[in-house]
């Protein structure tokens, strides 16, 4: 049963989207949970800042392979701003990942199914339970075989 569960990636920024792209290439089900309203919400907060890395260093190989069949062409030179990084790569990748990426989905907790501080036996054999809250206060839970925390340096 656990192999049918998705891997949950917390954060739809550069690292979260790259992790999702690698999982998609390996046919591993994945759900990306992003607290913000769009991809790379934290990057968008400093979108006017020019990055210290050139385009080739900012594009993950798996992400590029997913985008290339859509006609997307990787920028090859220059130092983009955060906004250019989003519009030129991160947003197209998130779009191509489609319904795997969920916005307005703040992760408020991660636990093991049926386990807590008092019930520890067999913890490693149980799937993860990811507790998610939306901005309207609605909450839901997802079960996952693994969780990748790519939530970044600060919350958006």
Residue ranges and their predicted role:
Residues 1-7, 25, 121, 138, ...:
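Extreme N-terminal leader/targeting segments of oxidoreductases
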Residues 4-32:
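N-terminal Rossmann-like FAD-binding beta1-loop-alpha1 element of flavoenzymes
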Residues 10-13, 35, 103, 144:
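A secondary-structure boundary/capping signal
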Residues 15, 38, 154:
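Conserved Rossmann-like nucleotide-cofactor binding loop
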Residues 19, 42, 112:
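Short glycine-/acidic-enriched loop or helix-start segments at secondary-structure transitions
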Residues 23, 45-49, 116-117:
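Short, glycine/charged-enriched secondary-structure capping and boundary segments
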Residues 36-88:
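Glycine-rich active-site loop/strand segments that organize a redox cofactor
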Residues 73-155:
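Feature captures the FAD/FMN-dependent oxidoreductase FAD-binding
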């Amino acid at each position: 049963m656990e192999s049918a569960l998705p891997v949950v990636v917390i954060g739809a920024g550069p690292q979260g989207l790259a992790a999702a792209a690698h999982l998609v290439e390996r046919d591993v089900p994945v759900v990306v949970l992003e607290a913000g309203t769009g991809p790379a919400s934290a990057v968008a907060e400093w979108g006017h800042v020019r990055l210290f890395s050139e385009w080739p260093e900012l594009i993950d190989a798996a992400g590029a392979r997913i985008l290339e069949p859509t006609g997307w062409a990787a920028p090859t030179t220059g130092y983009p701003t955060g906004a250019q990084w989003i519009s030129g790569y991160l947003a197209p990748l998130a779009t191509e990942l489609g319904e795997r990426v969920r916005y307005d989905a703040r992760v408020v907790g991660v636990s093991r199914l049926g386990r807590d501080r008092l019930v520890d036996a067999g913890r490693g054999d149980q799937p993860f339970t990811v507790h998610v809250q939306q901005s309207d206060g609605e909450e839901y839970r997802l079960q996952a075989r693994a969780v990748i925390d790519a939530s970044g340096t600060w919350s958006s």
